[in-house]
């Protein structure tokens, strides 16, 4: 239930992110989008290194203490985590501002400096979110995520327009930089809003937390030395894992820009613009289904940690199996749907026809990584929750090395250029997926069921993909026949109609096939986001017996 809440929120957040990016890119242009994407990539890495491991660390440690009813010690972990992010977040923010010009190009550096305060606020926000997740409640985190993204969307667009008005008489590149800076302001405004909300929620619940601490009969209180040792012990491998896991973006950026500028004659603006198409347009679309796996991972860490601490190996294995199966039920059809309907999806979100085919091509390749990223993200959480926190670090480092080699070879020896980034992303996620799976099997003695988890969803998704393709093309043919659309041309409104109808039919076909082939039962459907609604619909059309 809690995982479903967090997953639904994550998907809503990604959808809002996709929807606001479309008008934003129309305002700041592909060049501005490139500057923003470049700065955002570096901002993300600095955030990961400094404070981004805090939510998972706080969630795991506090959940373990809560299971033992050590409420005073849990509160000490909270206070220790705040001290940690004050120092780490402050240093990271200062580093980001002072060395921005040395890290990225001059234009992107101006955008990166705007992200500086957001790093500090994000650390504080992460502590609150991890603390509430440890209590088994994802509602506060979910609501704050949605609130953060709504404010981000509104302020990003408004600030982009405002900042560009300051330089309306300047050249297009200067306007693009200022528009990207406005977008970065929106990110900070969203994080600050979510932080204030979470602080208010904590204040409302503070009396309850205090009563628990007063009734705590724990004989031994942790010293603050022990508290910081626990935080560092847990945070360090989590940071290393997530940092290396996401370092691929920064590595891709550096390798791509260096090679295409030095060997293929691209200018900085051209390289940045093309990179923005990959990281600012194609990649965010794949983040929608991956958000489900991320939510499952966040939710599963405290629950698996609690079961593992109690020595309940069978309960731990069951939770892992259920999480993997649920993730695959969402990720596999999402990947197939994106591959089949890549061009219409991109055209709805980013109707700039000059780059439409390129972004659609990138998305088709990236669609494959949706399954692998979904599974590897989830299994990262499983390994962290069961105490094997160092394994994802090792796996991520190995995968990063393989990806770097593959990307460099593709850029130097093939004409793939920007498409090499998508191929490298698939390679990275596949390597992580395989290594994490083998480790879980070895360390936990766990073996994933294959037919109902992978094969049936894949067969159902392929059938769904065929139907979706012909429904979309069939409606297009009807519009051409009715002379509402010229053959070979695109119309945004008619494309939306065709796409919506194709997706609706695809969803029905997929779940009908999954249920009929025995891939999911009533209890498993209820565990999905809006699961009870799906069960009622399935009963009405006689796919399930009442």
Question: Where do the language-model regions lie?
Answer:
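Signature of the first transmembrane helix
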Residues: 1-56, 64, 93, 97, ...
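Interfacial/gating helices of multi-pass transporter permease domains
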Residues: 24-45, 107, 173-181, 229-234, ...
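Interfacial segments at transmembrane-helix termini and the short loops linking adjacent helices
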Residues: 101-115, 339-370, 484-490
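Membrane-proximal transmembrane or re-entrant/amphipathic helices at the cytosolic face
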Residues: 474-546
């Amino acid at each position: 239930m809690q995982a479903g809440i967090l997953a639904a929120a994550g998907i809503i957040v990604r959808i809002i992110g996709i929807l606001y990016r479309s008008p934003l890119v129309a305002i700041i242009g592909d060049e501005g989008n490139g500057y923003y994407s470049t700065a955002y990539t570096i901002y993300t890495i600095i955030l990961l290194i400094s404070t981004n491991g805090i939510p998972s660390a706080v969630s795991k440690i506090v959940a373990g203490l809560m299971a033992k009813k050590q409420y005073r010690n849990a509160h000490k972990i909270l206070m220790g985590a705040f001290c940690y992010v004050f120092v780490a977040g402050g240093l990271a923010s200062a580093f980001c501002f002072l060395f921005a010009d040395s890290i990225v190009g001059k234009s992107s550096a101006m955008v990166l400096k705007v992200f500086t305060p957001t790093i500090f606020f994000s650390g504080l926000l992460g502590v609150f979110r991890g603390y509430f997740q440890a209590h088994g409640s994802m509602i506060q985190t979910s609501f704050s995520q949605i609130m953060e993204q709504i404010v981000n969307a509104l302020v990003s667009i408004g600030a982009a327009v405002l900042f560009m008005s300051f330089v309306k008489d300047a050249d297009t590149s200067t306007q693009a930089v200022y528009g990207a800076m406005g977008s970065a302001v929106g990110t900070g405004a969203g994080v600050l809003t979510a932080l204030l909300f979470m602080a208010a929620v904590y204040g409302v619940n503070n009396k309850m937390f205090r009563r628990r601490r007063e009734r705590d009969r724990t004989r031994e209180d942790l010293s603050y030395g022990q508290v910081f040792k626990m935080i560092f012990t847990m945070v360090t491998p989590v940071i290393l894992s997530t940092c290396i896991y996401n370092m691929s973006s920064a590595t891709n950026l550096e390798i791509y820009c260096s090679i295409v500028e030095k060997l293929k004659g691209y200018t900085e603006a051209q390289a940045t613009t093309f990179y923005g198409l990959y990281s600012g347009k194609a990649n965010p679309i794949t983040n929608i289904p991956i958000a489900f796996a991320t939510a499952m991972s966040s939710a599963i860490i405290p629950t698996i940690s609690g079961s593992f601490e109690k020595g309940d190996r069978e309960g731990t294995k069951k939770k892992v199996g259920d999480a993997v199966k649920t993730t695959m039920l969402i990720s596999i059809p999402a990947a197939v749907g994106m591959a089949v309907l890549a061009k219409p999806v991109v055209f709805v979100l980013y109707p700039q026809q000059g780059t439409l085919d390129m972004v659609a091509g990138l998305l088709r390749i990236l669609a494959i990584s949706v399954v692998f990223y979904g599974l590897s993200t989830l299994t990262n959480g499983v390994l962290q929750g069961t105490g094997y926190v160092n394994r994802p670090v090792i796996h991520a480092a190995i995968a990063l090395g393989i990806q770097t080699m593959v990307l460099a070879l593709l850029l130097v020896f093939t004409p793939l250029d920007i498409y090499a980034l998508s191929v490298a992303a698939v390679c990275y996620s596949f390597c992580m997926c395989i290594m994490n799976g083998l480790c879980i099997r070895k360390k936990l003695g766990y073996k994933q069921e294959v037919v109902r988890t992978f094969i049936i969803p894949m067969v159902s998704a392929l059938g769904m993909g065929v139907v979706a393709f012909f429904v979309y093309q069939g409606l297009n043919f009807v519009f051409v026949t009715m002379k509402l659309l010229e053959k070979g041309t695109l119309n945004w409104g008619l494309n939306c109609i065709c796409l919506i109808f194709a997706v609706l039919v695809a969803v029905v076909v997929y779940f009908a096939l999954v249920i009929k082939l025995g891939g999911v039962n009533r209890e498993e459907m209820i565990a999905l986001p809006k699961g009870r609604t799906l069960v009622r619909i399935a009963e009405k059309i006689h796919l399930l017996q009442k």
